[in-house]
């Protein structure tokens, strides 16, 4: 967990986009079946259409809230189940534990009430024996390259059976 004295520019831009365009809420409400991995009445897991990492997964409540504490116990259980299921799918994808970064998004100060809380899992493998490293072009340009299109990643993840 990091606490910063200022809001990083990229996070500020994301918050402004959420406030002005309701981007995450609109995405959660209209994600295509090709990108959806799993959902119940309260929460969804999916590969974002602009995934930056192969097999990246986002987990979000359907209800637009700033943070998880604004959800009911039932909704929190749904988020938890989607998150655990997503991590299990990543671990089963290549038959070994998947290293990943998990980002939990809350509104920065000043953007409360205009944010849609979500969790992003950014897996560090692009194949069984290949880790995802940022290439020079990615570090220089900020554009991310991926070995797999989001729809194919979602299809592979969706096909994994969870016990």
Where are these regions (language model features)?
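HIT superfamily nucleotide-processing domains
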Residues: 1-163
């Amino acid at each position: 967990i990091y606490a910063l004295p200022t809001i990083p520019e990229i996070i500020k831009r994301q918050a402004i986009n959420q406030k002005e365009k309701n981007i995450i809420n609109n995405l959660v409400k209209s994600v295509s079946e090709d990108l959806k991995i799993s959902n119940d009445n309260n929460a969804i897991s999916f590969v974002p259409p602009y995934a930056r990492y192969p097999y990246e997964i986002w987990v979000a409540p359907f209800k637009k809230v700033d943070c998880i504490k604004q959800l009911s116990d039932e909704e929190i259980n749904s988020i938890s189940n989607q998150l655990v299921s997503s991590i299990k799918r990543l671990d089963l994808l290549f038959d070994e534990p998947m290293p990943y970064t998990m980002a939990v998004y809350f509104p920065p100060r000043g953007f409360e009430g205009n944010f849609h809380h979500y969790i992003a899992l950014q897996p560090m493998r692009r194949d069984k024996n290949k880790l995802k490293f940022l290439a020079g072009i990615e570090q220089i340009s900020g554009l991310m390259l991926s070995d797999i299109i989001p729809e194919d990643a979602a299809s592979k993840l969706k096909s994994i059976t969870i016990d």
